[in-house]
Amino acid sequence: MKKNISYGKHKTFPSKLNGLEKQHSLSKNERDNFPFLSNIPWDNANQGSDKNQLKGAKLIQEFVKHLPHKPGVYRMFDENGNVLYIGKARNLKKRVSNYTCEQRHNNRITRMIRATYHMEFVVTHTETEALLLEANLIKRLHPRFNVLLRDDKSFPYIIITENHRAPALYKHRGARTRKAHYFGPFASSSAVTQTINVLQRAFLLRTCTDSVLENRTRPCLLYQIKRCSAPCTHEINENDYRELVRGAKAFLSGKSQSVKNDMIQAMHKAAEDLDFEQAAVYRDRLSALSHIQSHQGINPQTIEEADVFAIAQKGGITCIQVFFFRMRQNWGNRSYFPKADPSFSRSEILASFLAQFYDDKPLPKLILLSEEIEEKTLLAEAFSLKANRKIFLSLPKQGERKTLVNHAYINAYEALGHKLAETATHTKLLQGIAEVFQLPQTPHRIEVYDNSHLMGTNAVGAMIVADQMGFLKNQYRKFNIRSTDITPGDDFGMMKEVIKRRFSRLIKEHGLPHESNSIKGEDEDCFSIWPNLILIDGGEGQINSVHTILSELKLDDFITVVGIAKGADRGAGHERFFIKGKTPFTLPPHDPILYFLQRLRDEAHRFAIKTHRIKRKKATLKNPLDEIKNIGSTRKRALLHHFGSAKIVASASLEDLTKVTGISVTIAQKIHNHFNEK
């Protein structure tokens, strides 16, 4: 039975902790992936104590007295309840004992110990489980003294659907819940799009939705330009289309040479039969396949499935290059720049990166590394536990595997060189912005806001973020304008709502800037959550609207707000800058700072317009079935597949509705009532 450990400095801490536990509880998906973590019984300090003035090493010494000699995970908190560090241990008592003396550690760990006001612990069955839990928590809580994976978008896949007379070819991102054959992961969305475009030319598979397919009466433009075989209007029979699907699956499964040989034979046979038009079709399809392979670069001959990781460091920046090989084909590569203190070794960074990287991604059979890591065996055991099959981690010394690692290493250094040059440029530009706007310090985080709407309809707000590393696209946010009190087209009212929602939530989650100590970033490795500069696309009226909200939230003294307004002729280069209490001013037309500010403004504008267009398109294409309660995507798809259109569903009888797969009598009655009560 566990003991509650009650040492720590708690002025307002307990309520903060309770909120933190609710905020960071495991999601259903995480409970499914990690069943042994379903209920995390954290030992925490919610009680008062005579020793509530303890902190740092002395506090840790008191915790150590009560810790077991068992594997588990520990969390360190600062005075305001923010997570400082998350670690795992084979033996909690021995591991945490290392923090009881400040003198034996480097500067990073010494600062971390001194900032510790509270700790929490959980005992796991094995060290492997502790490793998986540690990676999961680091990824969600972003403790500032850990190695952090900055950009962690899910990877796109190519899918070929099942259970249809004419399977379709789609791009897919997210959970693999759809019944389909999945091919990937691909390194980028553009790589998937390019591959699909070429596959359309090579195999003529459809890319339209099932409802579009069922309702077409004549072939679309893709058929005319030889990108689709038009199964919608039966321009191709089902057996021939099935052969095209089989060929596409074989090619994506790595049997490219076999597919090409079959096409070459078919081309020669068509030529012998004097069917030169058909021979030309095969020739063009072969050309498309060769185009894909020529752009894949290095393709392994002996490795069917592997991810390759190479790490490079220079100038305080770390780059990890990842290559994806599936079915003996190169599905692309991606560069990552994890946030890590210089005191971390390459081995430590790579090990932590791998654990976080595969927290929510499918694992390959083989993972190749450029660097030996201390806990390679433990990591392999953790990955095998997660994947329910044997996963191998290898540091190759020779052969094709070594060639792949060297190739990744070269790409890592090239990407690192580009990032260093870009960072140096951004740092200079940020220093220039501080001078131009007379800021007390160089901005470490800039947030830019803009609105977009069409005559007041489908109104949205958008926020983009930039720092010395460039645009932080994974931190962009969009806001659907909710207030019914705003007059359609009232840009000032929209901006007020966006700013209020953004910063009210920030205060709720992290407290005011002076409480969370992150507006200035007291440590260089602090994960910045508060901007010290806000840019608004607009003039005096807009910045007054923003200041009204910031004043209400008591943030007016912490954040500088600058408005960027177009000049009288609305031409680039004539922008006027507005700051509260100062005379509006302009910058020289060819000033690099002006160009950078224009880029920030234009990026916010682009993101706002894109968000608005997506919302408008969704509203335009809204299906009447979406308005019916308990009709999700699966039932909607079944109804459209059965009837062909929402219009026919609306006029269907109750008896006809019950004939649809997945539609019960109760649901059929709801659908019938919905359309007949109007």
Curated annotation (Swiss-Prot):
Keywords from the UniProt entry: Cytoplasm, DNA damage, DNA excision, DNA repair, Excision nuclease, SOS response
PROSITE patterns referenced in this protein's UniProt entry, alphabetically: GIY_YIG (PS50164), UVR (PS50151), UVRC (PS50165)
Basic residues biased stretches: 1-13
Chain segments annotated as transmembrane: none
Domain GIY-YIG: 69-147
Region (Disordered): 1-25
Compartments reported by the entry: Cytoplasm
GO biological process: nucleotide-excision repair; SOS response
Domain of life: Bacteria
Subunit structure: Interacts with UvrB in an incision complex.
The protein's role, per its UniProt record: The UvrABC repair system catalyzes the recognition and processing of DNA lesions. UvrC both incises the 5' and 3' sides of the lesion. The N-terminal half is responsible for the 3' incision and the C-terminal half is responsible for the 5' incision.
Protein name: UvrABC system protein C
Record organism: Bartonella quintana (strain Toulouse) (Rochalimaea quintana)
